[in-house]
Amino acid sequence: LALAHDLGHPPFGHSGEDALERVMAPWGGFDHNGHALRIVTRLESRYPGFDGLNLSWETLEGLAKHNGPIFEPGWALAEVDAAWPLDLASHAGLEAQIAAIADDIAYDNHDLDDGIRAGLFSIEEITAEVPFVADCWAAVTKSWPGVSARRRLVPELVREQIGRMVSDLLATTRSRLAEIDARSVADVRAAGRTIATLSPALSSEVRALKDFLRERMYRAPAVARLRDPSEAVVEGLFAALHDDPARLPGDWAAHCPADEPARARHVGDFVAGMTDRYALKLYEQLVGPSPLPRI
């Protein structure tokens, strides 16, 4: 689950997803979670008798609901749910819930590391605004009083934060399992709330970290300057291939449906499966000079 839940991300991360969602809006839009399920149930072809990877129902359910119940599924998820009813209105099992919170923990902490390394903000700035980081940084500098090199202490800060989050997650999850007297996965699904989660107190502190990263990293001018060109590449590729599906490679062209929305979704599947590098290369072949530097 932890490995598979990000399979549906298109090139250029969230910028690419936003662009693909816009251009596919007339045909139901695009969602990376639904696309991940589409990959493992339809697009992969590793067996002679059927499409997909032959994953268990529990794995499909976890991929669909790792972020919680779904009441208005998009077209891709609705197709999977029609074939393998996933009880979308209930919570997923513990494995999926743990994969989701583990992803959040890793994402937040390594983005902090990346932001400092990229010079988007300093230790002084983030500790002044985020009490949780300030507390962890104080613990790190106290444990290593003779170390002045920030490049050695920042990774230790990340370890300290992850350690505290994981310890809190374990304690909170055990407590919630005891509260519902869980004897089976059915009890977890029927609990009506997330079981594997951080405590309310730490969740509030981590929310302050997320808010800081959103303002100082994700919305930073240096990052924003890459967002529009990234979206332009995805939009240009989709338009070029949707207008002339014969320009798709090999089997993608041979099996492209003639009617909509199947054709648009087929082209969307192809674009969503690209790496950043391949997207830039193909854009230059089909559209023109890339608005982004080659990777």
Per-range role (PLM):
Residues S15, F30-G34, I39-I295:
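Histidine-centered, transition-metal-coordinating active-site segments
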Residues L1-P26, H32-N33:
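Aspartate-rich (DDxxD/NDxxD/DxxxD) Mg2+/diphosphate-binding motifs
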